[in-house]
Amino acid sequence: MENYINLFIRAVFIENLALSFFLGMCTFLAVSKKVKTAFGLGVAVIVVLGISVPVNNLIYHNILAPGALEWAGFPDADLSFLKFLTFIGVIAAIVQILEMALDKYVPALYNALGIFLPLITVNCAIFGGVAFMVERDYNFGESVVFGIGSGVGWALAIVALAAVREKLKYADVPDGLRGLGITFISVGLIGLGFMSFSGVSL
């Protein structure tokens, strides 16, 4: 249990996908103008990462990994060259299901997210989470915790940035820094804040 708690804390704070690895910056910067919209996208990312990482873990370890098809009578089979294609397909399917669910049950959030909801499919934060799971050889339980933790970390980062950007509307920002300029500085400062967790050993 302690291992899972440590993994979750590490995924949220120490190895934050947005602020440590700078993954998913396109949607991170574009949808962080309002806290409500940022929170909605953050929840969507948590759901997609929380499902896609463990599902891809099962597919990789039971079908794609070298020797994984021993149960089917093919002990020498190695389908790992298909992993990227498979991972993207699974992520796309999950995002499509989420998109249909939001359109039906939360149309206001669906309309607010607009084009950025289907863009979660190609959001490198989602693919990065899945790739890290394979690289670090997580088991199924660890992949569930890592997927949810990575999603929570990304959501926390985008909501924090959205809160700062909402306050910046009332700030006297120099003309040359308005828009993305002050946003990049804000992201850097939030990232520096999260760097303080890098000294934590778990």
Curated annotation (Swiss-Prot):
Keywords: Cell inner membrane, Cell membrane, Ion transport, Membrane, NAD, Sodium, Sodium transport, Translocase, Transmembrane, Transmembrane helix, Transport, Ubiquinone. Its EC number is 7.2.1.1. GO terms for cellular component: Gram-negative-bacterium-type cell wall; plasma membrane. GO terms for biological process: respiratory electron transport chain; sodium ion transport. It catalyses: a ubiquinone + n Na(+)(in) + NADH + H(+) = a ubiquinol + n Na(+)(out) + NAD(+). InterPro entries: NqrDE/RnfAE (IPR003667), NqrDE/RnfAE_oxidrdctase (IPR050133), NqrE (IPR010967). The chain crosses the membrane at residues 11-31, 39-59, 81-101, 114-134, 144-164, 180-200. It is found in: Cell inner membrane. Signal peptide: none annotated. It is a multi-pass membrane protein. HAMAP family: NqrE. This is Na(+)-translocating NADH-quinone reductase subunit E. It comes from Idiomarina loihiensis (strain ATCC BAA-735 / DSM 15497 / L2-TR).
